[in-house]
Amino acid sequence: MSLVNGSNSIHDGIEHDSGGGKALINPADTVLLLLDHQAGLFQVVKDIEVAQLRANVTMLAKLATLMKLPVITTASEPDGPNGPLMPEIRQSAPHAVHVPRRGEVNAWDNALFVKTVRETGRKTLIMAGVWTSVCVMFPALDAKAAGFNVYAVIDASGDPSEMASRTTVARFEQAGIVPTSANAVLCELQRTWNRSDAAEFAKLYGMVAPNYAAVAESYQRAEEVATKKVETVRAAVAAHK
């Protein structure tokens, strides 16, 4: 059967023994960890445009708010040269819990940070941070060793060089950590357009793929035109009754 005719799919809420979303990220088991997205560290990022990096991080924060995912942030020496966290995170995810550190490079070395993660009761961690090769990799490796499922969002993270980023991704793969992208996370968590908040998801796609915003605008305009035509026809029919 085709989707148009109502085939069984994840959109129906019907489970399948093979596929059907079971291998994808489960929102109900997920925590978003945003690590050291700080003004000073941004200045040495070379493997991605910082403007796009910030947009991807902001999108993840907005996505977490939309889907009611726990968000945990932390920063490395924010009063020193690393600088403050990017304000867009707090603006986009006001429910985020911030865990201060006492100089630990690896957030997983901070007992309060680990305790905060464990207290969510969730076992899937989506991590992003600056630098990828340090601030993401170190806690990702430790969390994986502690039994968590870990995803590293590479384009919501940044490194001083392409080489640093590539070697980090290789190490992730060796350790069983899943390298992913902001748009992949967005799609995995959304799953279907058949939902009441679909318009909000369309806005998020525009952040990670700016040209997609034009697609959404075009579709919205087409819907408005179609709705207006229907209303005109209904009014004409009513007038002749």
Regions found by a protein language model. Give the residues of each.
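Short acidic/histidine-rich motifs immediately flanking catalytic phosphotransfer sites
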Residues: 29, 121-123
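Well-ordered alpha-helical segments embedded in enzymatic catalytic cores
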Residues: 56-59, 112, 135
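Acidic, metal-coordinating catalytic cores used for nucleic-acid/nucleotide bond scission
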Residues: 78-80, 104-107, 132-136, 161
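A short acidic, amphipathic alpha-helical/loop segment
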Residues: 85-88, 112, 138-142
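Active-site acidic carboxylates
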Residues: 2-103, 149, 166-170, 177, ...
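A contiguous pocket-lining binding segment that forms or flanks enzyme active sites
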Residues: 124-182
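Glycine-rich oxoanion-binding loops at beta->alpha junctions
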Residues: 98-119
